[in-house]
Each structure stands twice: as C-alpha cells, then as structure tokens.
C-alpha cells in the first residue's frame, strides 16, 4: 500500500475513533458516566461496550498504518526505538480491549492489572515514539516545523500524564488512593486528546513526505 494511503488511513482511523468515543459521551446510557471522575474505559462495562472496543481497535489499526507510512517515507527507520515505541502503543491499545476494565472495589484481578499495565504502556509509548521520530528532523529545513509540532504534542501528552504520577507519589503520605486524589476521568480524557492529536500529526507528516516523493523533480 502506498504511504500516502497509509497516512490517510491513520488520520481516518483517528476521526472514526473520536466520533465513536464522542458519541458515547452524549448518547444514553453511557452519557451518564461522569467524565471528570470516571475513565474512558468505563464505557467498556456498559451495554455499548462494543462501540468502545471498536473505537480503540480502529485507533490501534490506524496507528499501525501511520507507523508503516513513517517507515515507507523514510521518516522513521523500521529498526528503531521509535518504531518499537509505536508498536507498543498499538499493542497496548489492543490489550486494553482484550483485558477489560476491572471494578477494583471488589478486589484485585489479573485481567484488571493487565488492563492497567496496558494503558500505562500505551499512554507512555506514544509520546516517546513522537519525541524519537522528531529528534532526527528537528533541524531539517523542510521537516523542522513538523518535528517541532510533533515534539510539542509528545511533551503535552507527558504533561497530561503527570497528574497520575503525582497521585501515585503522594498516596503513601495522604492515604488517599491515587485515582481518587485526582480527577482521573478528566486527566485521562485530556491525555487521550493529546495522544490522538499526536497520531494525526505523525500521519499528516508522513502524508506530506509521501506527497514530496511523488512530486516531479524541478530543475
């Protein structure tokens, strides 16, 4: 498949994901979920769980398409830390669906722990991938602007993740469980928006690179 089509697929997948998750926020009964306190994964426990699962898997597939587009255009080596991090992001998303959210009030569970670990891996892997991809191009005359935008979104994602780290760090001192110490739903939604924007940024960058490759030489 041509890199431009792969990049378009990546951006299209993000659009589908945003529409589906957005619908869960406004259509009953999932609209009753508190977006400030409850995580996005809460939708997987409701009757419209399939919508949530499809949205996340579509995003994972679009992320893989974006990764392939980055490789095909030469923006990212296939054998690189950035490629590994992007693959971990996509695998983490798939694992979030495979291991559904657990109600920790009834006690621990293996699949609940797997869900939580998969979420952390995914949320951290994408900004790392973005920073690694951009690092090689930050001084490039053509792609420096794209690299700067990618770095900005990668750093924004890490900033959005920071409240979770703070909540975990202060738990031993406050005695308040970390997910109650912060508005976890709002934090996760801000993080999710930053990360889907990062995927779009990477896909758009690879689409522009593919367009340059296809343009006739000027002499």
Named regions from a protein language model:
Residues 135-219:
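Terminal transmembrane helical module of multi-pass membrane proteins
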Residues 3-12, 75-88, 142-156:
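Interfacial segments of alpha-helical transmembrane regions
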Residues 27-32, 99-116, 168-189:
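Interfacial helix-loop-helix junctions of multi-pass membrane proteins
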Residues 93-143:
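Membrane-proximal helix-loop-helix units in multi-pass membrane proteins
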Residues 33-48, 180:
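Perimembrane loop-to-helix junctions flanking transmembrane segments
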Residues 42-61:
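Interfacial helix-start motif at the membrane-water boundary
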Residues 15-33:
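Alpha-helical transmembrane segments of multi-pass membrane proteins
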